[in-house]
Regions:
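Short loop/beta submotifs within extracellular cysteine-rich repeat domains
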Residues: 65, 84-86, 129-131
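Glycine-centered loop/turn positions within well-structured domains
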Residues: 41, 73, 83, 101, ...
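Short, conserved beta-strand element in jelly-roll/cupin
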Residues: 56-60, 68-85, 124
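Short, low-complexity cationic-aromatic patches
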Residues: 1-6, 45-51, 63-75, 107-116
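Short acidic-glycine-tyrosine-enriched beta hairpin
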Residues: 1-4, 87-107
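A short glycine-rich, His/Asp/Glu-containing loop-to-beta-strand
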Residues: 29-66
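Double-stranded beta-helix
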Residues: 7-38, 112-146
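Short, conserved secondary-structure segments in the cores of folded domains
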Residues: 55, 65, 74, 90-91, ...
């Protein structure tokens, strides 16, 4: 029984059994470079190649992001700041803290942040990174010939 005054968004890939993990707090800047001077951090990595992952996206103030697509859908929640998600066909979707959204696969879009910048946590249902049975930290750093 969950009680309280807060709100929750659950993004789930049916059939996937994820690992329990606790992350945070969200940092002011991402640890990796992203397009148009934005940054990103992998908050919850894929346990295996192809598994879902959770990422932080940080947009500095007044960013006009390059129009782009993703090969799979994206779920997002606006953590802080304000801006818009732009699609050439449907126009602008205003973004504000606490708002959740879904971008369908191959949906052309870009984010534009305002003077506050914009912070988004994005769920990716798949990943092109992650360990495999042939490539993983345990196996890669085990030497049977020494």
């Amino acid at each position: 029984n969950i009680q309280g005054q807060g709100e929750c968004a659950i993004f789930r890939k049916f059939g996937h059994r994820g690992l329990f993990s606790v992350g945070g707090p969200i940092e002011a800047n991402g640890r990796l470079c992203y397009i148009d001077n934005c940054t990103t951090t992998v908050l919850s990595p894929a346990a295996r190649l192809g598994d879902p992952c959770l990422n932080l996206l940080v947009f500095p103030e007044n960013v006009k992001q390059t129009l782009h697509i993703h090969p799979s859908l994206r779920y997002g929640i606006v953590v802080a700041g304000r801006g818009v998600c732009v699609n050439p066909s449907t126009g602008e979707l205003p973004l504000r803290p606490g708002m959740t959204f879904c971008l369908e696969e191959t949906y052309p879009h870009c984010f534009n942040s305002d003077k506050e910048g914009l912070v988004i946590v994005a769920y990716h249902p798949d990943s092109d990174m992650g360990p495999t049975d042939q490539q993983n930290p345990m196996l890669n750093r085990t030497y049977t010939r020494f």
